[in-house]
Design a protein with these regions (language model features):
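A long amphipathic alpha-helix within ATP-dependent nucleotide-binding catalytic cores
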Residues: 249-261, 306, 310, 314, ...
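A short glycine-rich, hydrophobically flanked beta-strand micro-motif that places a catalytic Asp/Glu
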Residues: 97-102, 320-324, 564-568, 692-705
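C-terminal active-site "lid" helix and adjoining low-complexity regulatory extension at the edge
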Residues: 637, 661-674, 688-692, 701-753
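ATP-binding N-terminal substructure of ATP-dependent carboxylate-amine bond-forming enzymes
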Residues: 417-484, 488-491
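Loop-rich catalytic cores of soluble enzymes, especially ATP-dependent carboxylate-amine ligases
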Residues: 5-10, 105-106, 116-135, 139, ...
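Sequence termini and other peripheral, non-core segments
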Residues: 1-54, 325-440, 469
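Active-site nucleotide/adenylate-binding loops and adjacent lid/helix of ATP-dependent enzymes
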Residues: 464-628, 677-680
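Terminal catalytic/cofactor-binding subdomain
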Residues: 1-130, 137-141
Length: 753
């Protein structure tokens, strides 16, 4: 099958360009001295066998991070980034992930704890591996690169050639496997990154002299005995050889056969002729210590192009490609990192072939530049990863300090904005929290519409859709419509016997002014009828007789909505109650933007100091908002006889805003354990009246320690899609991880950590 001709003659270039990529990344958990951790896999990440993202490999200390299959390099790295962050956040504070393939410090054999699994076969299998190969070689970590050619492309080729699509898949993937084994030496040259190991690693006493490119991919890595030779000349021969070794008990199972190419798509290789090879797992790659997640996005792209070019080009000799490729790969793996590649001419031809393919497929010019970058590395060995590692070793005299330093840096970077998931920082924080907790608990996540904050969650065959962090199928359609309309909210609650403020609904300034005479010097609140974000609200706690101030407040509210409410102001303190599935999970006191004097600094300086809190930012990508020094703040200070240059006495409080919204710089203070239970029950009843599973209830309460009566509270409003991050990361008090409660609501049969 001349695939290149078929593609060009039938205009399949675009379909051929579509692939699916997945990454599996192993890594050892270490302590800050570089010693491998002896702790068990983090309990909050259990059960590992049910988590598709975070598992363990051979050793209990060897964490394995697995991405979902993605359509492009950017997305697969994004998912890997997210999983990496989740893993680091849930590891003990003094643990890190070693960034190189081979640990700098290998523990005593007896101290290496084999991964703990539930299935007896998994335990038996690992005990067998220990007995046959020893523990040290299996402590080596790497990257597995999963690659699938688009099914539509395969079907088109099948239709054009009048061939069964399963046969097309098997033929193309078998060719790809042979080609990869033949030319993988180039990838070993470029990405080899395990140039040395301590003496105890070499259990039989034999070791290479000096530095090499890749111990992991050489005979010193985790390889089968020399008498295990499996042919890739055809799928039938591959199956015959592999099943024969298992039958003769030279291998305990098919998966004991270790090759840089593994076929995926069936439980056993014997099923591949009928089911077809679905994708190939390339197990060749060392960890790149200079990449925070073990591999760079540009290298995921280069490997993609390299693999695709192997399908594009014709085969040399499929009978000898495997043996020749093995020889080439071994020679490169054991060559010195600063040595010129002995197959330079062939390497340059491969790269030229890649560039020609890029042009013929009309791929981006950036791909040409990337290939040329690798061309430079081919003719200058000092630019390769292995050479850079050796330079670091020679500079430090040890790889230990270098590796630990990087491990600490990568964890510090991942935890710097600990309240967010950096790979998804374009999404709102509540959605990020749900994604993070879903990954932690092994619930599959698919971002359907990033701009609209829409995600798909799946666990145990159950699919749920979530918008904006907590809008789900559990709520009725009418519920948010009731809460959006403050007049309807008040009427519904009033009918149910809840205390709500009296007032008027108006739609113009003239209408409002007609009510002014009745409202002079009465405590009132002026606010939009249908807003959910605290915008356009003015509070006159002591009333006003100034018609200009009254008019300004009315116009401010009318900016946010065509209809506004003028309500009585109920005396007391406002609290936000977060209700989910008939239970109040969090209670928050929101304090207006303020600073506390120290007798030394001006108000402006105190604001600057307070804004240094990492939780403060734009309140979109941070849980809290930085306090501003604008006209509104200036007027608020003026009412208190203060200005930005005032130096407050120690303990003196200055308020820069009247309203307590987080979006205007307010403080969030957790009060869940301080509030009398009667108010929590009241909030649940209000949520039920709104027919809401998730609801933010705002109550004015005179004294939270005294039980609720009809006279000591008032309902300000009920909110759909209530903000979660101010509860999860409050300015002061205990964190309430409400995103976990959302997952518990959606997946009641699954244990959520």
């Amino acid at each position: 099958m001349e695939l290149k001709k078929i593609i060009k003659n039938n205009h399949l270039e675009e379909l051929f360009s579509k692939v699916t990529i997945g990454i599996e990344k192993e890594g050892q958990r270490i302590l800050e001295n570089g010693q491998i951790s002896k702790t068990d896999h983090p309990k909050v990440l259990e059960p590992r066998h049910k988590n598709p993202y975070i598992q363990t490999d051979f050793a209990e200390s060897q964490i394995e991070l697995i991405t979902t299959p993605e359509r492009n390099e950017k997305d697969v790295i994004r998912v890997l980034n997210a999983i990496h962050e989740v893993a680091l956040k849930n590891m003990p504070e003094d643990e890190y992930i070693w960034p190189l393939s081979i640990p700098a410090v290998l523990p005593e054999d007896k101290d290496i704890k084999v991964a703990q699994f539930e299935k007896e076969w998994d335990i038996v299998y690992r005990e067998y591996l220990v007995e046959k190969y020893g523990k040290y070689k299996q402590m080596v970590s790497g990257i597995h690169y999963n690659f699938q050619i688009d099914d539509d492309f395969m079907q088109n080729v099948a239709d054009i050639t009048n061939t069964d699509v399963v046969d097309v898949k098997n033929n193309i993937y078998m060719k790809l496997a042979r080609q990869f084994l033949r030319y993988q030496w180039l990838l070993v040259y470029l990405y080899g990154a395990s140039p040395f190991a301590e003496d105890k690693y070499f259990t039989n006493g034999k070791k290479p002299e000096g530095f090499v490119r890749s111990l992991r991919t050489s005979k010193y890595g985790y390889v089968n005995d020399d008498d295990i030779v499996v042919s890739y000349s055809s799928l039938e021969k591959y199956i015959s050889d592999l099943t024969g070794y298992v039958k003769d008990k030279k291998l305990i199972a098919e998966k004991e056969f270790y090759s840089s190419v593994r076929f995926r798509g069936a439980e056993t290789v014997a099923d591949l002729p009928k089911k077809g090879i679905k994708y190939i797992e390339f197990r060749l790659f060392d960890l790149n210590p200079f990449a925070p997640f073990g591999i760079l996005e540009k290298d995921v792209r280069f490997i993609h192009l390299f693999i695709k070019s192997l399908v594009w080009m014709e085969e040399e000799n499929k009978e000898t490609s495997e043996s020749k490729g093995k020889e080439y790969s071994e020679n490169i793996a054991l060559s010195h990192p600063l040595e010129m590649p002995i197959y330079l001419e062939e390497g340059l031809e491969l790269l030229d072939n890649m560039k020609n393919m890029v042009r013929e497929l009309s791929l981006p010019e950036s791909d040409i530049l990337l290939i040329e970058e690798k061309e430079n590395e081919l003719i200058d060995p000092s630019l390769t990863i292995a050479a850079q590692i050796v330079k670091e070793y020679e500079k430090e005299g040890s790889i230990l300090e270098f590796g630990v330093s990087l491990a600490k840096k990568y964890k510090e970077d991942a935890l710097r904005e600990y309240y967010s998931l950096s790979a998804y920082n374009n999404m709102e924080l509540s959605t990020q929290a749900v994604i993070e907790d879903a990954i932690k608990n092994g619930i599959k996540v698919d971002v359907i519409d990033e701009n609209d904050q829409f995600i798909r969650l799946e666990s145990g065959g159950v699919v749920e859709y979530v918008k904006n962090g907590n809008m789900t199928s559990k709520d009725t359609y009418i519920s948010p419509l009731i809460m959006e309309n403050k007049v309807v909210t008040k009427k519904v609650l009033s009918e149910k016997g809840f205390r709500v403020p009296g007032g008027y609904e108006v739609s113009t300034l003239d209408d409002a002014l007609l009510k002014f005479d009745y409202l002079i010097n009465k405590p009132i609140v002026i606010k939009p009828k249908s807003t959910n974000f605290g915008l356009g609200i003015t509070i006159f706690k002591h009333g006003t007789d100034n018609i200009e101030d009254f008019s300004k407040a009315v116009l401010l509210a009318l900016k946010e909505d065509k209809d506004i409410l003028i309500e009585e102001f109920i005396d007391g303190t406002e609290y936000r109650f977060f209700v989910i599935e008939g239970e109040t999970k969090a209670v928050l006191l929101r304090v207006p933007a303020n600073v506390v004097g120290d007798g030394k600094h001006t108000i402006a300086k105190l604001v600057e100091i307070k804004n240094e809190n990492p939780l403060r930012g734009d309140a979109k990508k941070t849980p809290l908002k930085k306090i501003e020094l604008g006209e509104i703040e200036s007027l608020q200070l003026k009412e208190q006889g203060l200005n930005f240059d005032t130096i407050l006495e120690e303990g003196q409080i200055a308020y820069l805003r009247e309203n307590s919204n987080i979006s205007t710089g307010g403080d969030s203070i957790d009060m869940t354990d301080e509030v009398d239970e009667s108010y929590k029950e009241l909030a649940v009843e209000i949520s039920d009246a709104m027919m809401a599973k998730v609801c933010g209830v705002d109550l004015i309460i005179k004294d939270i320690k005294q039980a609720a009566t009809n006279q000591n509270y008032g309902v300000i409003e009920a909110n759909f899609n209530p903000m979660m991050m101010m509860h999860i990361y409050p300015h002061k008090g205990k964190s309430r991880r409400l995103s976990l409660d959302v997952l518990r609501m959606l997946f009641p049969d699954r244990k959520i950590n």
